[in-house]
Structure formats: C-alpha cells, structure tokens
Amino acid sequence: MNQINKFIKNLYLIIITIILIIVISNDNNGLFINGQSLPDGFCPQPLIYRNSTNRKADIDNGYNFVGETNCLLPCPSPLFPKSQWESYFEMSLIMGSISMFASLFLIITYSPLINKKHTRHTVGILCMSIGIFFVMVSDGRQLWDIESPGEYKKYCPDTGRYARQSDTKCLTTGLFFQFGCVTAIGWWSILAVDLWMTIAKKVQTTKKQLLYYLIGINTVSLILTFGPVVKNQYGFGNAAIGCWMLDLKYQYGFFWIPVGICLSVGSVFIGLIFWEIYKISDAVKKRYLKKHIKPLCLIVLMCLEFLYMFIYYSYITANQPTYNKHVAEYIMCLIINAANVPGSYTCQLKTVSPTAQFLFLIAIRLMGLQGLIFYGLTAATKKVWANSWIYKDLLKLFKLFTTKLYNDSSSEEVENSNYSNNNSNYYSSNGYTTGGSDNGVGSGRSDKFTKSSSNGGAQDNNNNNNNNNNNNNNNNNNNNNNNNNSSSLEISGVESNNSTPRVNSPDNLQP
C-alpha cells in the first residue's frame, strides 16, 4: 500500500512538472509562474511554505512569495550561498568598525571642540567624515549588535520575512545609510572643487558662502533621505547587507542620479587639478605635489570607488531580466527534484559574481580608513592637536604627575640619608670604632671595641656632638673623663677607676 501511495505521489509531481514546463515556456517575462499553484502545504527546499490569509499584507510586511504560489524565498535570499552571506556580514563588521572609529577620530579632530581655526577645507573634511560615520554605524553588523554566525534577526525578523520600514531597526539603519552616503559624496565633490581652487589660487570662499554650502547640502541630503519614507521604501533586499530603498525607480531618483551628478562634478574638477599641476613649472610642481598629494590621492580613490559602484549597479540593473530567468530556472530545478531525496541533487542559481559583489560592498566601507590615512595622519592634524586645549591640559597633568613623583623620590632619599647620619653620629659620639676580625675578614660585627681618651679623640667627639644634640650630655661626660687621663686605656674585662667599664666578652655584654 505504501509503494502505491509513493507511486501516485511521484506521478502527481511529474504531471505538475510537465504543466509547469509548458507554462514557463510560454511566459518569458515572469520571475516564476503566473496563475499556477503547487499542492497545498508543499514547497521544495529551501523554499518555505506559508499559508497566507492576506497575501497583500504579507507582501507589504516583507514576505517574498514565489509567483502565485504559497512558497517563500528564504531570508537572506538564495542569490548567494550561506557561507558567502556570512563572509559579507563579517566583512561589514570588521571594515565597518575600523572605518567608524577612523571617521570618528576625524570628526573629533576637525570639530570646533579641537580645531578653533576653520576653513572651507576643514569644514569639508568634517562634514564628509560625519557622512561616512553615519554609513558605518548603520552597516550590516555593528559592534553593539553582533549576532551569532548564521543569524540575521535584524534583517530577517521571522522565518521567510525580510525586514521592512515597519521594523524600527531597519528604518533607522536605512535612514542613516542613505543620509550618510548622500552627505559623504556631496562633500567629496566640494572637496574636489576646494582642492582645485587652492591649487589654481582662485577666489577664496567666504564664511557666508561656506554657510550656504552647509545649508544647501544638508537640505538636499535630508530631502533625499526622508522622501522614500512616504512610500514605505526602506527594507531589506535580495542582494543587500542592510536596509535601503527597495524599488528601482526610487533608488535611481533618490540616490543614483544625485550620485551621478556629484561624481561628474568631482571628476571634472579632478581633471582640472591635474591640468593646473601640468601647467606649472617643475620646481613649483614638486612643491604643490608634496603639499597636496594626500588630499589628491583620497579624492581620486573615492572617485574610483564611487565610479565602480555606479557602473556595477548599472550593469546589474541592465541585466535584471537575465537574472530573473536564472531564478526561474533555479526554482524549476527545485520543483523537478522535489520527489528526490534531499542532498541527492544540486540546483545552482546563476547570479552575479561573488567577487564583484564583495568589491561593491567593501568599496564604501574603505572610505573611513582612507580618510584617516590621507587626512588624519598629516602635519596639519598634528598641529591641530598640539594647539588644542585637550593636549595642553594633558601636558599639564603629565608635568604635575612627574614633578610629584620626583619630589616624593627626593624626599625618600633625604630621609634615608638623615637616618644613616643619625646612626653614624650615635656610634661616633660614644667613641666606638669597629675593627675587622683577627683573620682580616670583615664580619659585619666588631670583635674589639676601642675607646679613645686623647685630645684628638675628644675633638672628634665634640665635632660629632654638634650633629647630634640628643647625645650632648653623654659626650661631655665622656670628654671630661677622657681629659682626666693622660693615656689610653684598653679595656679587657677590667674596670678603670676613671672610666665607665666596657666588656668585650660575649657572655658579659651590656645593652
């Protein structure tokens, strides 16, 4: 009976497959199948079945249905293997974190907090760094929101559901990313114009004109950022590692066309910069190149990165029908092999090159690090920090610390010296001298104690008494006793009538 049921099931799948092939062969425009459905509750892996009661609401919430079926594409999409997706997110975590801290350093360096002297050049660096910082804090994975490998709860909140604007984290990261990108490339083009004006020695920008730049670029950035919100355009897409605009027309209107304009302006002025350098003499040329080589390198590198992103995206968009066809073939392969044992067949999705996609994703995530190298590690940056109040206060604290440390060390040395002098004065004032042992080897203890009663000895004792006031009375008594005798007496276990007895026997030592 089981074999009969299995045969009927396989026959049913074969019939459905034949029908699907006929339908697809007559429909070249659809992503999958129009007006066709699979058996209820059945979806070949890795597709996910969903019993939808409100299909439109589910689509708006981020469920990506395959054609007219109840099958969902997994999240993240099968455009890339899971291992490739993981490498993309790990790259965003590492490079995004590095660029985030690098851009944060530039923001602090060129902010009014540290840099008191502002020019259009420093303001341009500051604003571009702010834009890059916004991009990095909204990247695929962040240091403060790291998920376990293989988990993408921020972008795939539920099984088979792609995050949408209604998800707070998705909307926040999407807004930050869009605002940061538009701001960064807008100020990049301003920096290209500024470098040309500096080298060509054109009219200097006034503070009023600089204020117009700030208001104009920020206003345009805010419009381009919040405009798509009206149409619920922010969400997690099939080939992204973060939330961004979903529909192609909004991507072009609110991002790629403005990017193309800024890219064109920047490229024109880069050409003018090289022309100005070409016209001047060799001696002056060397001086200008030495002075402006770092800003020029950064502007050219960012131009190449933005240009690659623009060309790559245009290529993907132009070949979208081809990729849709590949997706249809992939799903067809899954359906044909649905009756087979999982793992006994392989369905590969022919999509964009993983390497090209990796370069596309990493291009913008290098900009913070590049900004640090070409704008942060310069003599101008060193001068800004050297003149900052933070550096001066830290220098004062360091000097106070080292001075206190030196004074404490000197006080300790003085105390040790006084202690040694007091001990020496004590023994000298009592007329004791230490001698070596009989065998000539010093033992640290005296084998003989000698007391002098000569006038010279009295003078030495009197000199020592001047250094030790606490022993004056004892010294005077000793001196008087010494003066009453005309010769030295060596005490060897015998008391003298005119002197205090001293004993050299260990058994009879007195304190």
Swiss-Prot record:
Q: Which residue intervals are annotated with compositional bias (Gly residues) in the record?
A: 433-443
Q: Which residues lie on this side of the membrane: Cytoplasmic?
A: 115-122, 194-209, 275-295, 379-511
Instruction: Return the Polar residues bias intervals.
Output: 451-460, 486-511
* UniProt subcellular location: Membrane
The family database entries (InterPro entries) matched by this protein are listed as: GPCR_Fz/Smo-like
Q: Where is this region: Disordered?
A: 430-511
Gene3D superfamilies tied to this protein = Rhodopsin 7-helix transmembrane proteins
Alphabetical UniProt keywords:
Glycoprotein, Membrane, Receptor, Signal, Transmembrane, Transmembrane helix
Spell out the coiled coil positions from the record. none
Q: Which residues form the signal peptide?
A: 1-25
For membrane topology, the record states: Multi-pass membrane protein
Record field: transmembrane: 94-114, 123-143, 173-193, 210-230, 254-274, 296-316, 358-378
Name the predominant localization. Answer: membrane
Q: Which residues are glycosylated?
A: N51
Similarity comment: family membership: Belongs to the G-protein coupled receptor Fz/Smo family.
Spell out the protein name for this chain: Frizzled/smoothened-like sans CRD protein C
Species the sequence originates in: Dictyostelium discoideum
Taxonomic placement: Eukaryota, Amoebozoa, Evosea, Eumycetozoa, Dictyostelia
Please state the gene responsible for encoding this protein. fscC
